[in-house]
Amino acid sequence: MSSAIQLRGLAWDHRRCWGPLEASVPAYRALQPDIQVAWNRRSLWEFGEGRLDGPAADYDLVIYDHPFVGEVARDGLMLDLMRFLSVDQIASFA
């Protein structure tokens, strides 16, 4: 039985979002082999036309585009990721 942590992520479907995300996956998997993230994509239009709290409730990780960040912050839909990382994990991003 696998002890890997399985997370669900949602990103907006534009190369500016998923390009860097996909490029970072191999390095992240090498550093964190016990954490698996299954990424889905949603059009920016779908983000703009729908409620933003839906994806926040349905996914572990959500990448919002900048026009929505104010609403996301106002509605408390973000958590400080640093609370969930070890000192070594944070240092690996430097």
Question: Language-model features: where?
Answer:
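Conserved N-terminal structural module of periplasmic/extracytoplasmic solute-binding proteins
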Residues: 1-69
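Hinge/lid segment of periplasmic solute-binding proteins
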Residues: 69-94
